[in-house]
Amino acid sequence: MPEELRNMIEREAMRLIDERRKAQKMTIDDLARKLYPDKPLPAARMMIQRLRTAQGSKPPRKMNLGEYVELTRAVGLEPSATLTVIMQNFDETRI
């Protein structure tokens, strides 16, 4: 799978997670506290932000599978069903 396509899939996952988070009126801080209760809030927030936005000249950090599962569950999404929705947004010939 081309790297560009992997990046697009990850960005779509983050878009759906953010969409659900906002629909629930959950802030980034709320999500950070839920995912990383043992970390100071600024550090927890930064861990999420690195997945969402570019940091300086670097692209957003790649999301690993565990993070994907934690993020989707934290906003009330079912990981496998959400992945199915994400993959339906991409042409099979590109995958």
Q: Residue spans of the language-model regions?
A:
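Short, basic-rich loop-to-helix N-cap that marks the start of a DNA-contacting helix
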Residues: 55-73
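Short, charged recognition helix plus adjacent turn
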Residues: 2-7, 73, 80-95
